[in-house]
Amino acid sequence: MNINEPRDGGGFVLPFFNDSKKSRKSHAGRDSLKSNRVPFTKWVPDTVSYTTKPLKNAHRWLHLHNKTRNHFVATVAEFAGTTLFLFFAFSGTQVALLATPANDSNVVGTPSNPAQLLYVSLCFGFSLAVNAWVFFRISGGLFNPAVTMGMCIVGALPYFRGLLLIFAQIIGGIAAAAIVSALFPGPITFRTSLGGGTSIVQGLFIEMFLTAELVFTIFMLAAEKHKGTFIAPIGIGLSLFIAELTGVYFTGGSVNPARSFGPSVVSGQFTGYHWIYWVGPILGAILASAFYKFIKMLEYETANPGQDAGRVGEVIDPEAQAIKNRVSFASEGLVGRELDESGASHVHENGNHFGAPKEYGTKRRPFSDSPAPPNANDQFAGLSEGGLHTDEFANENIGGGHSGEGAMHRNKRDSEGTLVGNGKKGVLKVGAGGTGGAAVGSTNENLRDNTHNN
């Protein structure tokens, strides 16, 4: 419950500035002024009074503090997330390497048998998946300076925020190593080192390619917004799991400068090739970023369309999806939800479907400036190669689509789910809305009888 209630006279109450003589006023419209929210409260003042110097200064601070506060919250969350991620990963590694037969005295170093490799890899992969899922709403759940650098390169993260997160990640790695060292008996066993006869150059490139795979996974599952983004942490965790299975024996499976730097600081032992655990992941992030920008330049969405379809019969317009992935639209803008395989594309404007068949030579792009066709709510039918159809987002066009003979109708089905239009009854091609277009159809809406307007 908010203790700072608004007052008459356009002012607001801050702690130690309460005026009991003023009556309370409505909270209407405060949600639109979230940038002026009183810190550490849920209340947004309608206006700000300048009658006293403390309130005037408070108003100025309210306008300036939000950006700083957001950076602070993200930095703190990234520190906490990195600490938790590496704490459980380091703990698992410590257990795997210490829980060895009594006659095995050399337990410090890289895991030497498949059981240890699997145990360590699972600890890293699962720890990343869980903690990334917890913290991705706050800071992004990156936990890795190389990943953060890659996100900055592709423009998914501001550089200033990236620097703050990298600092938090490095400190988090040190904190996690210190906590594990203090809680668990025995020497630190989770430092990264080369093993299996791996040379420094080999270790460098192993780290580079493993990091590139992890960073590119994050780009495609998290930076790219799609219907599966909410489960991206699972794929990211599995990506790290695979990387650890491959790299733990040869390099310790760092793929994260903070993961290698923290244990070295706590143990006070730096190998002469420690630099490969910085240079390798950074090169991997650059490689992944370059490839990601390359496929974005080629509009990869058009190569395999329909990957974000959520219903039977729904086909995603690949060109619209490519545009949607590059720019931000208003919340009500549903862009390019459907496209015939050989017909013209269409758009959503305020919930209505506008468009024209292919024969008219009109291939409308999302949010086109060209005028809408007449009676746009009554969707036009396709011609020889199929035109446009509707889906459940269209006003009064629920379930519309093409029949077997290409006729168009509005919200009319028989008991068996077939579609009726222009007095002809045809079989729905693919689900609700259909794809592939129609063989014959009419674009003259005057040919429809009253039955088809129900």
Swiss-Prot record:
Catalytic activity: H2O(in) = H2O(out)
Record keywords, A-Z: Glycoprotein, Membrane, Repeat, Transmembrane, Transmembrane helix, Transport
Domain notes: Aquaporins contain two tandem repeats each containing three membrane-spanning domains and a pore-forming loop with the signature motif Asn-Pro-Ala (NPA).
Organism phylogeny: Eukaryota, Fungi, Dikarya, Ascomycota, Pezizomycotina
Induction data: Expression is higher in conidia than in vegetative hyphae.
Membrane topology: Multi-pass membrane protein
Membrane topology, Extracellular segments: 93-115, 185-202, 251-274
Disruption phenotype: Leads to a slight reduction in the vegetative growth rate and delayed conidiation.
Protein name (record): Aquaporin-7
Sequence motif: NPA 1, positions: 144-146
Coiled coil: none
GO terms under cellular component: plasma membrane
Glycan-carrying positions: 103
UniProt-listed InterPro entries: Aquaporin-like, Aquaporin_transptr, MIP
Family: Belongs to the MIP/aquaporin (TC 1.A.8) family.
Cytoplasmic side: 1-71, 137-163, 224-229, 296-454
